[in-house]
Design a protein with these regions (language model features):
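N-terminal phosphate-binding or glycine-rich loops at protein starts, especially the Walker A/P-loop
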Residues: 2-48
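Short Gly/Thr/Asp-enriched flexible loops that form oxyanion-binding sites at enzyme active sites
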Residues: 22-26, 108-121, 181
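Short, acidic/small-residue loops that bind anionic groups at enzyme active sites
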Residues: 41, 117-140, 144-149, 194-201
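Glycine-rich oxoanion-binding loops at beta->alpha junctions
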Residues: 47-101, 141-153
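Conserved small/polar residues in nucleotide/adenosyl-binding loops
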Residues: 206-209
Length: 209
């Protein structure tokens, strides 16, 4: 088994609630075991451009657990998908003697983590996306907060709808995954829910008006 002495942590893709908690927990666990931890800024872009900061003690992670977004910032990096970009990322790891990477993000982040692993850099992926579209896990980091936020907004919107005796259509995020729409639709008592996984015809909803 490889002896990890120094690791890097990054957040990539769209930000999700709870990413700071992930960074804090992973970094503190590593520091408690005598492993040096680098926070890599702007996802894989920071890995390519050697943009990182050493977390020398748990004190560097104080008061971030309740903050939204990610203190490491996040970005989508097309260069990382190229052979040249991957070579730069590997060179950064070798230069800084980084033994492994922890990457928090969605499906694109996981593809990047797989590529890093295939190039000899041990990488762990932590599912962090409001879309909840990562396999082999019931809930991704950020999904629960996204659902609760939508429910709160719909509860407020319902008052206006009832005041004007009308029906409103609410569009939520999720890209090609309908988890937010389905779960919040059930929680809010929606008359109907349309998700991308199930083909639907807008005409079939006219009876609701």
């Amino acid at each position: 088994m490889k002896n990890f002495r120094r690791i890097g942590i990054l957040t990539s893709g769209g930000d999700a609630p709870g990413m700071n908690a992930v960074v804090r927990a992973a970094a503190r666990a590593a520091l408690a075991r005598g492993v040096e931890v680098y926070g890599i800024y702007e996802g894989y872009k920071g890995l390519i451009h050697d943009n990182m900061k050493l977390f020398s003690s748990p004190a560097d992670l104080c008061n971030i657990i309740t903050r939204s977004g990610t203190i490491l910032y996040s970005d989508r990096c097309l260069e990382f998908k190229t052979p040249e970009g991957m070579a730069k990322a590997i060179a950064t790891c070798e230069k800084n003697h980084i033994d492994g990477i922890i990457a928090c993000g969605g499906d694109g982040t996981f593809r990047g983590a797989t590529d890093l692993s295939n190039h000899g850099i041990p990488t762990i992926g932590i599912p962090g996306t409001i879309d909840n579209d990562i396999t082999s896990t019931d809930y991704t980091v950020g999904f629960d907060t996204a659902m609760n936020t939508v429910v709160q907004m719909v509860d407020r919107l319902r008052d206006t709808c009832e005041s004007h005796a009308r029906c409103d259509v609410v569009e939520v995020m999720g890209r090609w995954a309908g988890h937010i729409a389905l779960r919040t639709g059930i929680a809010c008592g929606a008359s109907a829910v349309a998700i991308s996984e199930i083909p639907f015809d807008a005409v079939s909803y006219t009876h609701l008006t």
